[in-house]
């Protein structure tokens, strides 16, 4: 990985976490020490109900705060929606968009994901765009084609190393304990890099590509050593600061 692509370890809490969980946020802030700060960025994405309190507890720690989703519209009659501006107002700097759970369960299209990327940009947020194939698509030999289509159709013009992160999450590996082989990960991440180059030229070499899918302390070192893997999008293992920090510590220095 080029030195310009700083490792990013991001934690997605999904629909987990109550006020009592802020103790884990405090532990995360305390554990992000000088050695970790020297080698990687650390980002945590708790549920929206905890964002403001989490921002207060993370202040000055260097741990970044992210949202799990944003509405494509800036404001208006969208009951239950959370805009990018609201996230920014809460202290957020990044936002996950296009997570497979939303693509699958809520039928979010590539076009909707692209609209969310643009919404994030409007308020200075860094979108983490998720792509990945289902088990059925993988078994049918369609993984490369699916991921290529998602990258092409989810990203607007103007993507750069400073305004975009990609996360490859094989849907069949999320929360299942199954992980693809390092060779499989390298193949898809290499494909994503090639697609980014075809769309954005040399700028693509600086765009970070994360791996997400049952990342744990005991497999992090192997996964993070794969070519074109620039970090991780961690699910369940990010809920406990000790586990999340263990993944960060297991990540090889670049």
Curated annotation (Swiss-Prot):
<dbReference type="GO" id="GO:0046166">
    <property type="term" value="P:glyceraldehyde-3-phosphate biosynthetic process"/>
</dbReference>
<dbReference type="InterPro" id="IPR020861">
    <property type="entry name" value="Triosephosphate_isomerase_AS"/>
</dbReference>
<comment type="similarity">
    <text>Belongs to the triosephosphate isomerase family.</text>
</comment>
<keyword id="KW-0312">Gluconeogenesis</keyword>
<dbReference type="Pfam" id="PF00121">
    <property type="entry name" value="TIM"/>
</dbReference>
<comment type="function">
    <text>Involved in the gluconeogenesis. Catalyzes stereospecifically the conversion of dihydroxyacetone phosphate (DHAP) to D-glyceraldehyde-3-phosphate (G3P).</text>
</comment>
<comment type="subunit">
    <text>Homodimer.</text>
</comment>
<keyword id="KW-0413">Isomerase</keyword>
<comment type="pathway">
    <text>Carbohydrate biosynthesis; gluconeogenesis.</text>
</comment>
<keyword id="KW-0324">Glycolysis</keyword>
<feature type="active site" description="Proton acceptor">
    <location>
        <position position="169"/>
    </location>
</feature>
<feature type="binding site">
    <location>
        <position position="175"/>
    </location>
    <ligand>
        <name>substrate</name>
    </ligand>
</feature>
<protein>
    <recommendedName>
        <fullName>Triosephosphate isomerase</fullName>
        <ecNumber>5.3.1.1</ecNumber>
    </recommendedName>
</protein>
<dbReference type="GO" id="GO:0006094">
    <property type="term" value="P:gluconeogenesis"/>
</dbReference>
<feature type="binding site">
    <location>
        <position position="214"/>
    </location>
    <ligand>
        <name>substrate</name>
    </ligand>
</feature>
<feature type="active site" description="Electrophile">
    <location>
        <position position="99"/>
    </location>
</feature>
<dbReference type="InterPro" id="IPR013785">
    <property type="entry name" value="Aldolase_TIM"/>
</dbReference>
<keyword id="KW-0963">Cytoplasm</keyword>
<feature type="binding site">
    <location>
        <begin position="235"/>
        <end position="236"/>
    </location>
    <ligand>
        <name>substrate</name>
    </ligand>
</feature>
<dbReference type="InterPro" id="IPR000652">
    <property type="entry name" value="Triosephosphate_isomerase"/>
</dbReference>
<dbReference type="GO" id="GO:0006096">
    <property type="term" value="P:glycolytic process"/>
</dbReference>
<dbReference type="GO" id="GO:0005829">
    <property type="term" value="C:cytosol"/>
</dbReference>
<dbReference type="GO" id="GO:0019563">
    <property type="term" value="P:glycerol catabolic process"/>
</dbReference>
<comment type="pathway">
    <text>Carbohydrate degradation; glycolysis; D-glyceraldehyde 3-phosphate from glycerone phosphate: step 1/1.</text>
</comment>
<dbReference type="InterPro" id="IPR022896">
    <property type="entry name" value="TrioseP_Isoase_bac/euk"/>
</dbReference>
<feature type="binding site">
    <location>
        <begin position="12"/>
        <end position="14"/>
    </location>
    <ligand>
        <name>substrate</name>
    </ligand>
</feature>
<dbReference type="InterPro" id="IPR035990">
    <property type="entry name" value="TIM_sf"/>
</dbReference>
<dbReference type="GO" id="GO:0004807">
    <property type="term" value="F:triose-phosphate isomerase activity"/>
</dbReference>
